[in-house]
């Protein structure tokens, strides 16, 4: 299946590396002009430079998705450069893992800091809301568009030590379904992808036995690659996915059924 994004403008949050960078590359290779939004200035500029040298049309905008003013500036810069926005991929996300409480000898000895809970909520959930609310008027101005949000397989079954992360990813599914109802008749589809274990810079720091265990838990027998997730994002952003709305697409190698 050939996917053509010629004439389309896509925004990818968290686009400086990993899944976001792979997605930006795939969109650009298929004809889209791409805006990378990321708060990591050096990494984002380097990513945009790399993609530009590959012949793609890319803009990097230093953006903090937790700050409405920063997002508004990113929207303004993107529209000024490319003339509009057709696709929003809410990919930015962080983790701050800890148990709700730590118990030793029957006594609570610690737990998840409130600041860590709030930080993950701000990026992974509120950031999705802020970016989407800022971009939707521009999708409407183009007669419609695509919004794809990042959730996770853990939104379904939970994950030890990830109260904050799981809460955000479950919330993203809820927002996705609400927005699919609210925007569908206006030509905007809203979907989500739910990655499983993906080989990124973060997982590369894990011990080899842990990575092997993660692969073994996945029925496909391997970790996913950033390109696997990028392909899913691009499909849901494509004209071929016009009648898919409110869906959550698993990109997990069968992890959900294997656990």
Predicted feature residues:
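Short C-terminal tail/terminal secondary-structure segment
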Residues: 1-4, 157, 233-234, 245-259
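Substrate-binding pocket helix/loop in short-chain dehydrogenase/reductase
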Residues: 99-118, 214
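C-terminal helical subdomain
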Residues: 129, 192, 215-240, 244, ...
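Active-site helix of classical SDR
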Residues: 132, 168, 176
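Alpha-helical segment proximal to the catalytic Tyr-Lys
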Residues: 137, 180-182, 242
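Residue(s) in the substrate-gating loop at a strand-loop-helix junction
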Residues: 152
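Short, small/polar-rich loop/turn modules that mediate ligand/substrate recognition or access, typified
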Residues: 184, 189, 244-246
